Amino acid sequence: MNILFAGGGTGGHLYPAVAMAEEVQRMVPGASVLFAGTSRGIEAREVPRLGYRLHLLEVRGLRRGRSLKDMAANIGIAADFAAALASAVALVRRERPDVVVGTGGFVSAPVLFAAQLLGKKTLIQEQNAFPGVTTRLLSALATEVHLSFAEAARYLPKQKGVMVSGNPARSFTQVDASAAREHFGLDPSRPTLLVFGGSRGARSINNAVLRHHDLFCAAANLLWQTGSVDFERIRDACPPSRHLQIVPYIEEMGVAYSASDLVLCRAGASSIAELTNLAKPSVLVPYPYATGDHQRHNARALVHSGAAEVIEDSVLDSEESAAAIMELLHDGARRSAMSEAAGRLGAPDAARHLALRIISLAGTKQGS
């Protein structure tokens, strides 16, 4: 069985593909897996490190502005896409995959389209509540389309073969909350606010929490991943405290989630998958410049289900926003209701379910 995964650029597009690939090879030990990506994406480093084969294509995303400069750049990008499509056709013909899986990012479009032109079975896995342009354009020709949010279906041209399967995410082993807090040097008896904005951090989140950290630490523990860029600035501005732990990056994220009673973070698809799989109440701050404003769509889905609250990036540092976070830290019953709502949205078996669909499309029996 040969499976070709196309997706990357960011971890949000790559790691769901990796999770599915791992499950496919666990279920079908002899399965051959190949990734297609670009030299500029995270996949150029991560896929070889994980031990998978990687084929690089040169492709860029269209600029969304309307200036003459953007239009001129898009002419060159269109030429690049044509070349990438030709390379993708050659790749699909050479590798003869049984199924081609697209998870988004610039590279997924030419590879999926090439597979569809050649009559290959294709599966699209869409992470966001507002589907990416590749999903919207190519879903009508896909064999199956798997969504993380039911809301995404309304943006697709057809409903046949479309199903909600969740977003494959990292799995974490939960530990006792008190022990988890002690692991980070925090007061085990206090509720804990976990803050993160990605591996590089989020400047607006960091600035807002810096402004109000004394208020948060007066009532709770604050476990704060600043990212590498802001770490020294934030650390130097905050005196040491039994109720405050500032780190550039949290390696043991499962322990951090276990320690937390409330999470303040962006609304990226991977973070939301982790929050819902672990039934964590959250305050989401959508990144205002995300493509297609997809983080706001993601956050809205959780808010409508009662699993989260949203604070806009532009007002995060306000007194009102800090008060809203404090209110949640003081209201255990409300957090409990949010946790139950988040858990109902979770799909911890998403990678396994999608791997089974890939194996079925390939016409291969599990374990063969």
Swiss-Prot record:
Its EC number is 2.4.1.227. The keyword Membrane applies. It is an enzyme of class 2 (transferase). It comes from the Bacteria. One of its GO terms (biological process) is carbohydrate metabolic process. It is a peripheral membrane protein. One of its GO terms (molecular function) is UDP-N-acetyl-D-glucosamine:N-acetylmuramoyl-L-alanyl-D-glutamyl-meso-2,6-diaminopimelyl-D-alanyl-D-alanine-diphosphoundecaprenol 4-beta-N-acetylglucosaminlytransferase activity. Pfam families: Glyco_tran_28_C, Glyco_transf_28. It catalyses: di-trans,octa-cis-undecaprenyl diphospho-N-acetyl-alpha-D-muramoyl-L-alanyl-D-glutamyl-meso-2,6-diaminopimeloyl-D-alanyl-D-alanine + UDP-N-acetyl-alpha-D-glucosamine = di-trans,octa-cis-undecaprenyl diphospho-[N-acetyl-alpha-D-glucosaminyl-(1->4)]-N-acetyl-alpha-D-muramoyl-L-alanyl-D-glutamyl-meso-2,6-diaminopimeloyl-D-alanyl-D-alanine + UDP + H(+). Pathway: Cell wall biogenesis; peptidoglycan biosynthesis. UDP-N-acetyl-alpha-D-glucosamine binds at residues 10-12, 128, 170, 199, 250, 295. Its main location: membrane. Keywords: Cell cycle, Cell division, Cell inner membrane, Cell membrane, Cell shape, Cell wall biogenesis/degradation, Glycosyltransferase, Membrane, Peptidoglycan synthesis, Transferase. It is found in: Cell inner membrane. SUPFAM superfamilies: UDP-Glycosyltransferase/glycogen phosphorylase. GO terms for cellular component: plasma membrane. Cell wall formation. Catalyzes the transfer of a GlcNAc subunit on undecaprenyl-pyrophosphoryl-MurNAc-pentapeptide (lipid intermediate I) to form undecaprenyl-pyrophosphoryl-MurNAc-(pentapeptide)GlcNAc (lipid intermediate II). NCBIfam families: murG. Belongs to the glycosyltransferase 28 family. MurG subfamily. This is UDP-N-acetylglucosamine--N-acetylmuramyl-(pentapeptide) pyrophosphoryl-undecaprenol N-acetylglucosamine transferase. It comes from Chlorobium phaeovibrioides (strain DSM 265 / 1930).
